[in-house]
Amino acid sequence: MSQAKTGILLANLGTPEAPTPAAVKRYLRQFLSDTRVVDTPRVLWWPLLRGVILPIRSPRVAKLYQSVWMEEGSPLMVYSRRQEKALAARLPDMPVALGMSYGKPSLESAVENLLSQDVEHIVVLALYPQYSCSTVAAVWDELARILATRRHIPGITFIRDYADDEMYIAALVNSARASFAKHGEPDLLLLSYHGIPQRYADEGDDYPQRCRDTTRELVSALGLPPEKVMMTFQSRFGREPWLTPYTDETLKMLGEKGVKHVQVMSPGFSADCLETLEEIAVQNREFFLEAGGTKYEYIPALNDSPEHIEMMVSLVTTRR
């Protein structure tokens, strides 16, 4: 019996199509309308989103995107397309398609792309190393919606996450060591993960534990003493409590306490984007230096590095 033709769906969050208020508004409207992201009752959320948040945030966020926009486009899209191309080159017999939860290319277009190539089994790799209901589960929901009305659906392998995968940890270790070799070993390595509301964790999201799993394996592999590493959470939104400690407040505190040299890595981001290139590399650098620090480096995401691509190859070929 011949083996079913398998395709790979690479999934990520998404990005505006242009660094303009109009494009950012379209993107944020879709992103912030997902109940996996914001679960406030719609009767309360819609007026706030449409009447206050989108009009105020869209122009401001557009300016931030303009500061990091690359010649080829949005950093997240540029690196995601490179990942897609590199993975396809490594797996010539397995079609690869990129799909975003919000914006273009959509997850639906990616699924249609694969099915048009007579794929009978799809391996879904959501490029979020640590599971969260607001990221990985949102991909699951959309995939279920896409397939809900089909008479014939393909076999599905859904990779929940890879927080402690050996090849993922090894790639992070080598990235950190390369930064240490270039800039000197810092007084402290800060591991900054994207935050989620504390309430989501209280209700069962194991994201904080998966972040701790990554941190534990990374610190062990690096051989650093515990006092030279901290784990924090960034990018909080809204007024309710999010996972702590907060990255920005921690960096201010470190500068005030006399820590002079920090390097910051964001292990939860598979590709550099606004939250790493602007929030971490620029905003938080300023917070640390203004508080008394003297040396600050951001360690880039794994992006389309060869080690990262090999990790993807391993995940999609061994977990199906």
Swiss-Prot record:
As recorded in UniProt, its EC number(s) are: 4.98.1.1
Give the transmembrane region(s).
Answer: none
Q: What Gene Ontology molecular function terms does this protein carry?
A: ferrochelatase activity; metal ion binding
Residues engaged in binding Fe cation: H194, E275
Give GO terms for biological process: heme biosynthetic process
Gene3D superfamilies from the entry?
3.40.50.1400
Coiled-coil spans are none
Q: Name one GO cellular component term.
A: cytoplasm
- Which keywords belong to this entry? Cytoplasm, Heme biosynthesis, Iron, Lyase, Metal-binding, Porphyrin biosynthesis
Its annotated pathway reads:
Porphyrin-containing compound metabolism; protoheme biosynthesis; protoheme from protoporphyrin-IX: step 1/1
Q: Which Pfam families match?
A: Ferrochelatase
Which InterPro entries does the UniProt record give? Answer: Ferrochelatase, Ferrochelatase_AS, Ferrochelatase_C, Ferrochelatase_N
**Record's keyword annotation contains Metal-binding:** yes
Q: Where in the cell is it found?
A: Cytoplasm
This protein's record includes keyword Metal-binding: yes
Q: In terms of one coarse class, where is the protein primarily found?
A: cytoplasm
Reaction(s) the record says it catalyses:
heme b + 2 H(+) = protoporphyrin IX + Fe(2+)
Homology family: Belongs to the ferrochelatase family.
Main role? Catalyzes the ferrous insertion into protoporphyrin IX.
Q: What is this protein called?
A: Ferrochelatase
In the UniProt record, what gene is named as encoding this protein? hemH
